[in-house]
Regions:
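Acidic (Asp/Glu-rich) sequence patches and key acidic residues
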Residues: 1-126
Length: 126
């Protein structure tokens, strides 16, 4: 048990809004994290800033290029470490190189999806 997180892509034309897409279109996972609470808490704050009111569990969130830019900026500057809210399912590992590296790889991969005319969504479950 614990926090599982992934990013998936769908065609841009499938997007209905920042929180849903037309499920008649195929989606494909392209990135996975396990218990990266920094990413989860960062995404939850973005979700809330966009009007999300429910618990941020099993909620999808479309990420735009500017969101990826901000995530990368916050990671490079170390601000991501401020999102250190722990939880029973979130683990307690410190922010180390592997967390940094996984976020940077994700940002690169998300940008590749944008170039392919795909939308990027984040999802998580705990």
């Amino acid at each position: 048990m614990g926090l599982d997180q992934w990013a998936f892509r769908v065609k841009n034309k499938a997007v209905l809004n920042r929180f849903e897409y037309n499920q008649d279109y195929e989606h494909k996972q392209f990135f996975y994290w396990r218990k990266n609470r920094y990413v989860q808490n960062w995404m939850e704050k973005l979700y809330q800033s966009l009007g999300g009111k429910d618990e941020f569990n099993l909620k999808i969130l479309q990420l735009l290029p500017e969101d990826i830019d901000k995530l990368e900026e916050d990671t490079k500057s170390g601000k991501i470490k401020e999102y250190n809210k722990s939880g029973f399912f979130f683990g307690d590992q410190p922010f180390e190189y592997q967390e940094y590296d996984s976020i940077m790889r994700f940002c690169r991969m998300a940008r590749e999806e944008f170039k392919r005319d795909n939308a990027v969504f984040y999802d998580s479950w705990y």
